Amino acid sequence: MITKTSKNAARLKRHARVRAKLSGTPERPRLNVFRSNKHIYAQVIDDVNGVTLVSASTLDKDFNAENGSDTAAAAKVGELVAKRASEKGITNVVFDRGGYLYHGRVKALADAAREAGLEF
């Protein structure tokens, strides 16, 4: 019998393949994106030391929007994570889309982070 794998299981396999080749360093940390049905999260991670340097999400107290699951909210999270990263002196990052397609909310977050000063 043919079984169909869930979308999230397929995404996790894609993410594992990408993570095998991609890691963040202290000089160029990894900007990781996680997308749920209601919210979006972004973290800047130093994989060598295993430390999250900066994070932002639609659940933050600094974030005030009615809806956390649209592209406008994702763009605000991108601006917020870029602002927090620049305060810590981080300008160059490696973008990790987390196995998601580079489209919609993930693309909006990435574009807003680029416009706010992050380079990737």
From Swiss-Prot:
InterPro entries (UniProt xref): Ribosomal_uL18_bac-type (IPR004389), Ribosomal_uL18_bac/euk (IPR005484)
CDD domains from the UniProt entry: Ribosomal_L18_L5e
UniProt keyword rRNA-binding present: yes
A GO-annotated cellular component: cytosolic large ribosomal subunit
A single GO molecular function term of this UniProt record: 5S rRNA binding
GO BP annotations, alphabetical order: translation
UniProt superkingdom: Bacteria
RNA-binding is among the record's keywords: yes
Keywords recorded for this protein, A-Z: Ribonucleoprotein, Ribosomal protein, RNA-binding, rRNA-binding
Pfam families recorded: Ribosomal_L18p
Family note: Belongs to the universal ribosomal protein uL18 family.
Role description: This is one of the proteins that bind and probably mediate the attachment of the 5S RNA into the large ribosomal subunit, where it forms part of the central protuberance.
Subunit structure: Part of the 50S ribosomal subunit; part of the 5S rRNA/L5/L18/L25 subcomplex. Contacts the 5S and 23S rRNAs.
Full protein name: Large ribosomal subunit protein uL18
Organism for this UniProt entry: Bacillus licheniformis (strain ATCC 14580 / DSM 13 / JCM 2505 / CCUG 7422 / NBRC 12200 / NCIMB 9375 / NCTC 10341 / NRRL NRS-1264 / Gibson 46)
